[in-house]
């Protein structure tokens, strides 16, 4: 077992039409690291995160998550991952608590165990008072929190986030950043994209 949570070797991504988003990048992230991919729009950050999270198909190259080659055993790799993309990934008409509870069930967490886990997660993210609200009524910042709750409910070893604080006001951004640092301090490796230099420098 290596010391790395993520190993990328010569990763390339070319989209239909010939747009080359990634031109052979290589990267290693150690277990327990908090790693930020910094760059302007169009730099390939979202493509990289999407490929790591198995949401985007790579053109070539190798991706290993805790030594698991995603080409050979993507199912096991997914169990180790929590993914927060930029796009909303839940029904806007479902209740907040139901969205996270359903996600727990997807990972095989028994209802008796899931119930207190969901309550704890929603409280930590400031969503407990909104647990019976439909997701469509939430602000953009709270929808982002809900996506993080979904991604963390199965306690992944690696959390990846694509612009988690984009479009969020300064106060909420600070709260989310503090929460992510707390998660990292408890042992979860975190990789995120950002175009905020001050965040990357933390």
Predicted feature locations:
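Conserved ABC ATPase "signature" region
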Residues: 101, 105, 112-130
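Hydrophobic anchor residue at the start of the ABC signature
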Residues: 148
């Amino acid at each position: 077992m290596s010391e790395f949570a993520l190993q990328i070797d010569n990763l390339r991504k070319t989209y239909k039409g010939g747009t080359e988003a990634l031109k052979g990048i290589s990267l290693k992230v150690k277990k327990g690291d908090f790693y930020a991919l910094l760059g302007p729009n169009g730099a390939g950050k979202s493509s990289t995160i999407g490929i790591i999270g198995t949401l985007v198909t790579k053109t070539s190259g190798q991706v290993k998550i805790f030594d698991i080659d995603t080409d050979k055993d993507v199912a096991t790799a997914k169990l180790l991952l929590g993914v927060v993309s930029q796009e909303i990934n839940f029904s806007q008409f479902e209740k907040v608590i139901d969205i996270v509870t359903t996600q727990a069930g997807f990972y095989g967490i028994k209802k008796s165990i899931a119930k207190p886990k969901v309550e704890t997660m929603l409280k930590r993210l400031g969503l407990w008072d909104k647990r019976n609200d439909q997701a469509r009524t939430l602000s953009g910042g709270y929808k982002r929190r809900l996506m993080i709750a979904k991604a963390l409910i199965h306690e992944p070893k690696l959390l990846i986030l694509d612009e988690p604080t984009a479009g969020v006001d300064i106060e909420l951004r600070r709260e989310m950043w503090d929460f992510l640092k707390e998660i990292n301090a408890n042992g979860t490796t975190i990789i995120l994209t950002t175009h905020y230099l001050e965040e990357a420098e933390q």
